[in-house]
From Swiss-Prot:
Name of the protein in question: ATP phosphoribosyltransferase regulatory subunit
Gene3D superfamilies: Anticodon-binding domain, Bira Bifunctional Protein, Domain 2
Subcellular location(s) of the protein: Cytoplasm
Pathway: Amino-acid biosynthesis; L-histidine biosynthesis; L-histidine from 5-phospho-alpha-D-ribose 1-diphosphate: step 1/9
Family: Belongs to the class-II aminoacyl-tRNA synthetase family. HisZ subfamily.
HAMAP family the record matches: HisZ (MF_00125)
Highest taxon of source: Bacteria
Length: 438
């Protein structure tokens, strides 16, 4: 018999197949996040995979426009885009489909976007987003809701050692505008401030014609990072009204976050330059210990829906699900997925009883698979272990009597006999599990 040669079936760079174990973990993460969103009164929207390029581009910054996948639509003759971010889609939907509905809109979503990545960057072109948008409220309370939900979702996933960095584009924008620097110089300075590169900031300022007072104001930005005391230092540094209003806004949000009980996870970074061309107020990013990239990010964007003809204040944030997956996989102490509960191993010729037991277990909410392939006990146990199944229930055979099943804990092979009548009773539970050899 001629051996079959496996075909080569490579994937494009920047995308991957997620096999059952990782797919389970992604579903687990998304489910935990969605539960928090729903508890806060947010309702799900499912956005399309395609948009007309000119429509989606109206809601994108220059960076995301450059990363958007485009192609010609055979039906309309127009340019089609695969969205590189879901928030502009939500803005379009609110401005058109939900225009007549009362405000505020509490919307959540979960989906994938595509972004071009630099050839040598090694970054994924496929991004899993789970996020919320609160549209129609311009208040510190709305901003505080976003931050609190981010904290609650991270705690729900089992994280304890994480921080949410709070910034405010109004603060840094006010200082930059008051400086009167040329746009090119301002962009260089913002990049250096964002990297916390103090020497580069000083070098750029040394070449500028600004007064010593203005230089001191700008040079202070990279060090305005820490706890609430940063606001006092920033108040001494900033002299313009825009920056002072931003500090007052952050202070109000912090008061509310203290009431929500999440202050222990907060830091303030007034040198944050992310989203200066997009955000309009408070911004934030979430970081988990051991991860260099943010696992969530968001903030206020009061001008986005106006680009679609419906001016409304808005705030929101999104989780990077794959970043969360990487963080969870580095933490063996954190549950990262829901494993399968039971594998039914039938050693009887008659299938009826095994089928009935499996059906009963599913009614009780236990995920239950049958090992339909005929194999021995050890091979079935090995299969259960490799498929990440917690328990194997043996029906028939030498391990149990005619009125019993044998329940095995897959992790260590320990098992116990259980009466079949108990399996069909309301008191049956897997919580305790086998605790002794029988």
């Amino acid at each position: 018999m001629t051996p079959i040669t496996p075909i080569e079936a490579p994937l494009p760079k920047g995308v991957t197949d997620f096999l059952p174990e990782k797919a389970d973990k992604i579903g687990y993460i998304e489910g935990k996040i969605r539960k928090v969103f729903e508890l806060w009164g947010f309702r799900r929207i499912i956005t399309p995979l395609l948009e007309f390029e000119d429509v989606i581009a109206a809601g994108l910054g220059d960076d995301l426009k450059a990363k958007t996948f485009r192609f010609d639509d055979r039906q309309s003759g127009k340019l089609i885009a695969v969205p590189s971010d879901i928030t502009p889609q939500i803005a379009r939907i609110v401005a058109t489909r939900l225009r007549g509905y009362p405000l505020p809109h509490r919307i959540c979503y979960s989906g994938r976007v595509l972004r071009h990545a630099e050839l040598q960057s090694g970054r994924s072109r496929e991004i899993f987003q789970s996020g919320v948008e609160l549209i129609g409220l311009d208040s510190p309370e709305a901003d505080a809701e976003m931050v609190t939900m981010a904290v609650e979702a991270l705690k729900g996933l089992g994280f304890r050692d994480f921080k949410i960095d709070l910034g405010h584009v109004g603060f840094i924008r006010g200082i930059m505008t008051a400086s009167g620097l040329e746009v090119a110089v301002r962009n260089r300075l913002q990049e250096a401030i964002g990297k916390k590169d103090v020497s580069a900031v000083r070098s750029i300022l040394a070449e500028s014609p600004l007064s010593d007072a203005a230089k001191d104001e700008l040079a202070a930005l990279p060090r305005l990072f820490g706890g609430r005391e940063v606001l006092d230092e920033a108040g001494r540094v900033a002299t313009n009204d825009t920056s002072r209003r931003a500090l007052d806004n952050i202070s109000q949000v912090l008061d509310l976050l203290d009431i929500h009980g999440v202050s222990d996870h907060l830091t303030i970074d007034l040198g944050e330059v992310r989203g200066l061309d997009y955000h309009t107020g408070l911004t934030f990013e979430g970081f988990v210990t051991g991860m260099g990239e943010a696992v969530c990010s968001g903030g206020r964007y009061d001008t986005l829906t106006a680009r679609y003809g419906f001016p409304a204040p808005a705030t929101g944030f999104t989780f990077n699900v794959l970043a969360l997956l990487s963080a969870l996989e580095k933490r063996p102490d954190v549950e990262a997925s829901k494993t399968r509960d039971i594998l039914i191993f039938n050693q009887q010729d008659d299938r009826r009883e095994a089928l009935e037991i499996a059906q009963q277990l599913r009614r009780r909410g236990y995920t239950t698979a049958r090992d339909i392939i005929r194999r021995n006990f050890d091979d079935s146990l090995d299969y259960a272990r490799r498929m990440n199944i917690l328990h194997m229930m043996v029906v028939g055979g030498d391990q149990c009597g005619p009125d019993e099943v044998y329940l095995v804990r897959v992790a260590d092979g320990q098992g116990q006999r259980i009466k079949k009548a108990e399996v069909f009773s309301e008191r049956f539970s897997l919580d305790a599990g086998p605790d002794k050899e029988s």
